[in-house]
Curated annotation (Swiss-Prot):
The keyword Repeat applies. InterPro entries: Iml2/TPR_39, TPR-like_helical_dom_sf. The gene is Ttc39c. TPR repeats lie at residues 254-287, 292-325, 424-457. Keywords: Repeat, TPR repeat. It comes from the Eukaryota. Belongs to the TTC39 family. This is Tetratricopeptide repeat protein 39C. One of its GO terms (biological process) is otolith morphogenesis. It comes from Rattus norvegicus.
Length: 522
């Protein structure tokens, strides 16, 4: 009961990012961990002690299963506490979270090995085959008292946390990987996916959560961090297969409908995606956090369609209702309002952005404040607000979801901007638009101009490194320019620092270089 309540508390915190809910989740998780701490002794060692004392093995079985379950819960609590720590995005929080994960890793690894050993012993007992030399010890006695269902449930329980752990570590920004390696645990993406898949098909209570974690990874993480390089639809087949298998079991689930919308958005079926998100919004009538996630996607899909009025309505509601990053929502609201032509109303909201700036170490809020500062002092133009909307679509990897007619309209809107302070940004966005349109030669030219534009360092410091990354990725597509492409990727990673969304770009560069190593072994 305690773990279930603390997990709900954790989910609530992660969906709202409200400070008081995050603190409550930490307290609840620590309480649950303390309840289980007294049972943290090693499972196999405990069994040996019981056997030595001539205690009937069958009587020890419930205790053994209970101890394994408690250890898994402790590790789960550690992972969730680490995640809550990482959300703060401070160096001290990363270090603290890393040490917490170290403890979780040791427990997961031991439980995983113990459960696999018990499953092997159980199978050999059933088939009455002689034990291997590795398993030939007194522990095989207890396998007789463990049911296959209990072992399967335990394997499902540990696989959820074990899989999520591997997946999260495999996506750590490269500049933090050295710290992770020093702590002594690896991150294996394929192992993570395999474990989560096992957990999703198990009878453990976290099976639905494992399914949602897989859908989140395939429809949110993979496209956002460009883990599949220029393939913007990587992971969609896996996500659709999961929905096909599970949809009948959860016909009225707002979350499953939400992920259906994510798949449709990534397939550029924006109208269908909007229908799914609106349906999910209605299904989540009593679930405020899920409603906000749906509203966020409705706002983004509306921006993708250049329907700034509907986008404004969604983001304004989020600004007023959500406690997570009101500063960011205010910026998006102002951008969309200005893009409709209401520049005076937009300026009033741009002035609110600074007042709503609360999370000083949050990159998204820092970006929002810097961008709003200019329009706080002078009335924005509609053209600059449209450019700002295209900018966030680019930074959040949403341009590949746009239709060809809308991309062409965006290209025209960029050309209409006549402001010397945003020349580098304009060229970066034009390069990205032409890349989506399939005009590689034009894209290369615009990216080259953006990469050479020194004037953007003051107002848009991220433009040059992002342009180097984009240019490098394009050059990787041709055998004769692969070496130059790799050089540009390394340049984007090593020659720039202190710009907006630096970690985000490092993850994308890391993924691009990793895919290159797979094609051309070093």
């Amino acid at each position: 009961m305690s773990f279930g309540a603390s997990f709900v508390s954790f989910l609530n915190a992660m969906m709202t990012f409200e400070e008081e809910k995050m603190q409550l989740a930490c307290d609840d998780l620590k309480t649950t961990e303390k309840l289980c701490e007294s049972e943290e002794a090693g499972v196999i060692e405990t069994i040996k002690n019981k056997i030595k004392k001539n205690v009937d093995a069958r009587k020890s079985t419930p205790s053994m299963v209970d101890r394994l379950q408690r250890q898994i819960i402790i590790a789960d609590c550690q992972v969730y506490l680490a995640v809550l720590s990482f959300v703060k995005q401070e160096l001290s929080a990363y270090i603290k979270g890393g040490w917490i994960l170290r403890k979780a890793w040791k427990i997961y690894n031991k439980c995983y090995v113990d459960i696999n050993a018990l499953q092997e012993l159980h199978q050999k007992t059933l088939t009455e085959e002689p034990l291997s030399s590795d398993a030939a010890n007194d522990n095989h006695i207890v396998a007789e008292g463990v049911t296959e269902e209990a072992l399967s449930r335990l394997k499902g329980a540990v696989s959820f946390g074990y899989g999520l752990f591997h997946l999260c570590i495999s996506m750590v920004p490269p500049n933090l990987l050295k710290i992770i390696n020093l702590l002594g645990f690896p991150g294996d993406r394929l192992q993570g996916l395999s474990s989560l898949t096992y957990a999703s098909e198990s009878k453990d209570m976290k099976a639905p959560l494992a399914t949602l974690a897989l859908l989140w990874y395939h429809t949110v993480v993979r496209p956002f961090f460009a883990l599949d390089g220029s393939d913007n639809k990587g992971g969609l087949d896996e996500a659709k297969a999961i929905l096909l298998r599970k949809e009948s079991a959860y016909p009225n689930s707002s979350l499953f409908m939400f992920f259906k919308g994510r798949i449709q958005r990534l397939e550029c079926q924006i109208n269908s995606a909007l229908t799914s998100f609106h349906t999910a919004l209605e299904l989540a009538v009593d679930q405020r956090e899920i409603q906000h996630v749906c509203l966020y996607e409705i706002g983004w899909c509306s921006m993708i369609e250049l329907n700034f009025k509907d986008a404004f309505d969604s983001f304004e509601r989020l600004k007023n209702e959500s406690r997570w990053s009101q500063c960011y929502y205010a910026y998006l609201t102002a951008v969309c309002q200005g893009a409709t032509g209401d520049v005076d109303g937009a300026q009033l909201i741009f002035k609110e952005v600074q007042k709503l700036f609360k999370r000083k170490n949050n990159q998204i809020e820092q970006f929002s404040v810097k961008k709003a500062e200019r329009f706080r002092k002078q009335t924005p133009t509609r053209a600059l607000c449209v450019l700002a909307s295209i900018e966030v679509l680019y930074l959040w990897k949403a341009l590949p979801n746009c239709s060809l007619p809308n991309l062409q309209r965006m290209s025209q809107a960029c050309h209409e901007v006549d402001d010397s302070s945003v020349v580098g940004l304009k060229h970066l966005l034009l390069g990205a638009i032409h890349k989506c349109l399939g005009n590689s030669q034009d894209a290369v030219q615009f990216f080259q101009r953006a990469a050479k534009d020194e004037s953007c360092r003051q107002n848009n410091s991220y433009v040059q490194p992002y342009a180097c990354y984009e240019l490098g990725c394009l050059l990787l597509d041709r055998a004769e320019t692969v070496a130059r492409g790799r050089t540009l990727l390394l340049q984007a990673k090593e020659d720039f620092s202190g710009y907006d969304f630096e970690n985000r770009l490092h993850v994308r560069v890391h993924a691009a270089l990793a895919s290159l190593r797979e094609l051309v072994p070093q």
